[in-house]
Amino acid sequence: MSSIIDIFAREILDSRGNPTVEVEVELDSGAVGRAAVPSGASTGAFEAVELRDGDKSRYLGKGVLKAVQNVNDIIAPELIGMEAQDQVAIDKAMIELDGTPNKSKLGANAILGVSLAVAKAAAEECGLPLYQYIGGVNAKTLPVPMMNILNGGKHADNNVDIQEFMIMPVGAPNFREALRMCSEVYHNLKNVLHSKGLSTTVGDEGGFAPNLTSNEEAIQVILEAIEKAGYVPGEDIVLALDPAATEMYKEDGKYHFEGEGIVRTSAEMVDFWEQLVNKYPIVSIEDGLAEEDWNGWKLLTERLGKKIQLVGDDLFVTNTQRLSKGISMGVANSILIKLNQIGTLTETLDAIEMAKRAGYTAVVSHRSGETEDSTIADLVVGVNAGQIKTGAPARTDRVAKYNQLLRIEEVLGSTAQYLGKNAFYNIKK
């Protein structure tokens, strides 16, 4: 085992041109780990705090020099000398050093950068790929991509209310073929949109962002693209939605679909999602209701929880306390896992473990503001999660994760598993 001899943070840019934190950790063996921290656009109110400088004269107030300084001046002196493989102790030390419930003192972006860089350095020290260091000898499940190919909401400058329309290649025999299927549908979608005279500009996550007559039209053009690519909707490829309903939820307690000019109550939202699920091959809905609409979520779960995957993102924010509440209430049946929502690798793994024990799936996810860091690719295999959400097959910040998964599948060889439809163990057959 090797101890930490140096920790250094710097300010770099993410995929939106905003600053973020990158951390390097060096061990006395010479092993080095480097990690960059992502950033979300539609963020849950209960997420750990991303520390920004607020100095409008630099990066419009979005600088992260305070977080960088916190790593270099406060966290580093505390952790230097600790054993890199003591991940739980290291993360615990940072949580205690911060001392707030939401990491607002040091910043979740500072703490997470160190947490992940430590894990990477320890993996290198052990001579193991990161996925195997995290998951051990049984880390072998490649994820079904939940690929966002059409963007709306906060991820795009268009009139589509639902934030993400995604495809999932459940009929693929392995990850490599799954990625090919998604890429072919993506290119066919571009042609379909072109043929209708619609825009093929892309949103933050690489999906197309056209103006459409309705949210339902988005589903229809994707189904057309799936068929044009030679695949059967509902068999080869299924659909997933992320309405990001918290963004639609207003002070009147109702959901405002501003693109369509429609206002819905919680009960009407449940009716709306049920109608879409009955009409189209939708297998997963994320954040179908707002983060504090627990009663609405309970109704949604009662109506659709045995039929499709209901993913809590803003609802759970990778937080075991909120997940525990959801489990006890019988709300949702899946959790979205975003490292920077909670701020340490240890707490992320705790949330995944709690979800699995309760029969909930865990979907490992990127953020809309990403970097070339591909840690989540290793994480999703390490914990055998079976599903990953990391954008369209466009923009290097997204493709970096897919390419890392291709490499991992290649290394695993015949031991690699791709679960397809069996990834949804939370849906009662």
Swiss-Prot record:
Positions that bind (2R)-2-phosphoglycerate: Q163, K338, R367, S368, K389
Protein's name in the database: Enolase
Cofactor(s) named in the record: Mg(2+)
Main location: cytoplasm
Recorded GO CC terms: cell surface; extracellular region; phosphopyruvate hydratase complex
Species in which this protein is naturally found: Thermoanaerobacter sp. (strain X514)
UniProt keyword terms in alphabetical order: Cytoplasm, Glycolysis, Lyase, Magnesium, Metal-binding, Secreted
Subcellular location: Cytoplasm; Secreted; Cell surface
Reaction equation(s) it catalyzes: (2R)-2-phosphoglycerate = phosphoenolpyruvate + H2O
Homology family: Belongs to the enolase family.
Active site: E205 (proton donor), K338 (proton acceptor)
Gene3D superfamilies: Enolase-like C-terminal domain, Enolase-like, N-terminal domain
InterPro entries reported for this sequence: Enolase (IPR000941), Enolase-like_C_sf (IPR036849), Enolase-like_N (IPR029017), Enolase_C (IPR020810), Enolase_CS (IPR020809), Enolase_N (IPR020811)
